[in-house]
Amino acid sequence: MDKRWSLQGLTALVTGGASGIGHAIVEELAGFGAKIHVCDISKTLLNQSLSEWEKKGFQVSGSVCDASNRLERETLMQTVTTIFDGKLNILVNNVGTIRTKPTIEYEAEDFSFLISTNLESAYHLSQLSHPLLKASGNGIITFISSAAGIVSFDAASIYGLTKGALNQLARNLACEWAKDGIRANAVAPNFITTALAKPFLEDAGFNEILSSRTPLGRAGEPREVASLVAFLCLPAASYITGQTICVDGGLTVNGFSYQP
């Protein structure tokens, strides 16, 4: 295989990788030959996934971690440093969650929870990963953002601002860390068929609106996000950095349409 299209011999850390988009990303990266460490807050889901990946012959290890907790993030990176001998090629900041409320109904705890989970975790893990990414000689950071960080989603103002911040962080790190051989990009999905999105997608009215606003007429699948993440990590994508790329079925480019 052309080395441009292989991750053989490369190492990766995927946060929140035991389910949903993260799970699909692990499978995609492992399929290209990467050796991966996964962290997840759920011990049960993590163990189930690790067993599944072992049967598939993937090189995946894992540890339980609440990525919103600073001390647990530091412990995670100590583990990754040991496992990968001080070098890391790929960091996928995938952990994220949502709470939907009108803006005037959000409370301080909601703000703190969403900021620490969606934004602070990715920022701090990027800081902690920097020496490992630099040491690898070829570092790639991918932030899992959202279309909500680009266009307005009702009742999700805090979620949207955390995702918009990730898009900007990707731009900043792409410029600041390029000299260290590190690329950074953000991937911004539409609603994807995961457990997190299930309550929304099971609502017939919501689905009708989503389909009408999305040119491709449907929610996305986790593997459709994972395929882009994997591409951005490949040597073939070596000149792509600082970008926010939407995987949204056309949602963010859909304008106004009227047909009398």
Curated annotation (Swiss-Prot):
InterPro entries: NAD(P)-bd_dom_sf (IPR036291), SDR_fam (IPR002347), TR (IPR045000). NADP(+) binds at residues 13-37. The active site is at Y159. Disulfide bonds: none annotated. Gene3D superfamilies: NAD(P)-binding Rossmann-like Domain. This is Tropinone reductase homolog At2g29330. GO terms for cellular component: peroxisome. One of its GO terms (molecular function) is oxidoreductase activity. Keywords: NADP, Oxidoreductase. Substrate binds at S146. It comes from the Eukaryota. Its EC number is 1.1.1.-. Belongs to the short-chain dehydrogenases/reductases (SDR) family. SDR65C subfamily. Reductase active only on small flexible lipophilic carbonyls. No activity with cyclic monoterpenes, tropinone, nitrogen-containing tropinone analogs, tropine or pseudotropine as substrate. The keyword Lipoprotein does not apply. It holds the Pfam family adh_short_C2. It comes from Arabidopsis thaliana (Mouse-ear cress).
